[in-house]
């Protein structure tokens, strides 16, 4: 989570503000986009693996994929936002091909949607660990 947060903060600083107009995303350098997308990909991988481990610990199995883990996490209340399912689609899209327009759109969604979802998920997991 920390590395994704650092990447998001670098981009926000480069653009000079937290709320971006639509064209601002196109001004982000390709290197920053690629870096943020990579950090998003492995943060997503870690997140769904933690979901899977928690679900298996709770006796829920078999969990075979990120889609299974995410669906179960929604079902048991580990996460509460269905945009996690969209996250899987974007993660698969960025892993399979690189397209500048797609990258720009995914970066926008990472900054506006997915990063906050990861932070909320981290809080949930930390709360579960304390209890």
Feature map (PLM): residue ranges:
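Solvent-exposed interaction patches of small proteins and small membrane subunits
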Residues: 1-131
């Amino acid at each position: 989570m920390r590395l994704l947060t650092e990447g998001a903060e670098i981009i926000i600083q480069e653009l000079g503000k937290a709320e971006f107009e639509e064209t601002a995303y196109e001004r982000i350098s390709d290197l920053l986009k690629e870096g943020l997308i990579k950090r998003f990909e492995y943060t997503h991988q870690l997140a769904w693996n933690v979901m899977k481990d928690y679900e298996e610990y709770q006796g829920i199995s078999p969990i075979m994929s990120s889609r299974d883990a995410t669906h179960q996490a929604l079902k048991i209340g580990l996460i509460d936002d269905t945009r996690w399912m969209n996250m899987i689609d974007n993660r698969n899209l960025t892993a399979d091909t690189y397209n500048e327009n797609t990258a720009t759109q995914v970066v926008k969604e990472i900054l506006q949607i997915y990063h906050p979802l990861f932070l909320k998920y981290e809080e949930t997991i930390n709360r579960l660990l304390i209890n």
